[in-house]
Amino acid sequence: KVAILLEQRKRMEQEFDAMDRVSYVPSHGNYLLTRFDDHLATDLYEALVKKGIFVRPFSDPRLTHDLRISVGTPDQTTRVLEAISDLI
């Protein structure tokens, strides 16, 4: 299971590297702290929740452009990456 999570985290990093308006803090955990340009994080959070994809927003003013996105199964990774790609 750890190998799958590591593989999916790497996949998410590669996909985010290819996206405009998205960056992330490299992680050794099972999530990525993902930063979006402008106020995109709030809009993305709301749109992802409507799709049944739950990510964690932050109320701290320094993190208002950020979402914590957990690394999951290959299917979950595909779902979240496709949703974000469609929304940005």
Question: Could you tell me what each predicted segment is?
Answer:
Residues K1-A3, I88:
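N-terminal/domain-start segments enriched in small and hydrophobic, helix-friendly residues
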Residues L5-L6, F16-K51, L67:
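Conserved PLP-binding catalytic core of the aspartate aminotransferase-like
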